[in-house]
Amino acid sequence: MRSIRPLLAATGLVAALALTATACGPTEEEGADKPAATASGSTEKGGGIPADLADKLKKHGVDPDKWRDGEWKNWDKDKWLREAKDFVNPVIEGLWKPDRMKSAKDPAKTMSAGDISGDQGVTDPEPRPVTAEREKTPYHNYAAPVGKVFFDSPKGHMVCSGTVVKDPKNPGKSNLVWTAGHCVHAGSAGGWYRNIVFVPAYNDKGKSAAALRNAQPQEIAPYGAYWADWASTSGEWIKDGGPTGGEGAPYDYAVLHVKPEQGTKSLEETVGNALAVNFDAPEIARISAMGAWGYPAAPPYDGLIMHKCVDRPGRLSISPATPTMYRIGCSMTGGSSGGGWFSEGSDGKLALVSNTSIGPVTSGWLAGPHLGEGAEQIFTMMSDKYGAQ
């Protein structure tokens, strides 16, 4: 019989995340009179692509005007930028309208039992299923740092989850978002995804599809859509990531830097808080509970409602040559990918320690990477690069 200690810890963990929300969210009056912000980044007057991005596109043989007018839909291998240094994500004004967001699909990373037989020596028994619980609304009061990551892939409009994280070089004014590598890059078979945006507090009041049918844009994206002007993921994910995670799964993490709308506050100031990232979490046996938050989109879920799972973590090994991953019981499905996993540190404060990467075809559990030295290097690089922005 499982110990009741994780259940006690879980209660504290849920309360701790609720306490992180300090934002005074959009008021009813603001929602009625103001359209949702759509982060325009540093676009030139008239909606043009910034000169630096235009030059970068030209360097790769892409006409900036044609890109804006639909050339981004060309996924031919010679046009699909792949290397870490080649990320481009020009803002296309008005692209992510509410209906486009609602039509986005999950980039499912599912595995069969045979996919995880590489090293059973460090794989614990499969956890009991934990039914995901709906987050309380409004989300900006209970899980302010959590939101959705939208992007385009060769398969169409896609969606993941993400978390606003603290920026050590920009305290209190972070524009960094943590998500999964497979939410920004296709891995070994492809390149960078396109039109990547972060939408904090998506569907803030947790309304149903029917209730949102005639909703105003600010009901879908109360703080607008923040376009990523840079993304970074692990070299291992770019090299080894696959449709079911593969040997890239233990390195399936990414950091986005998003650009606030000109003249507005940082993302952290806007939503009211951000989570620290802990790259030195204790060994799994010493962690009594982890909580995963996200927006599951594959059946039986529809991607509109934020959910959470809390469980004592176990170990999952994909290969003897790769780091052991965390695994928890959770019924969340695709769409929750990239969502943060949180745990209390020795100081009693909540921190992000992983993100949703993979799960089985039948759901029932989720696995996420251990964030170690490699993840910290990527994060530090992003903080150093954008610390003053």
Pin down the residues of each PLM region.
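Secretory targeting and sorting signals
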Residues: 1-28
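N-terminal low-complexity, Pro/Thr-rich disordered segments
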Residues: 21-139, 244, 389
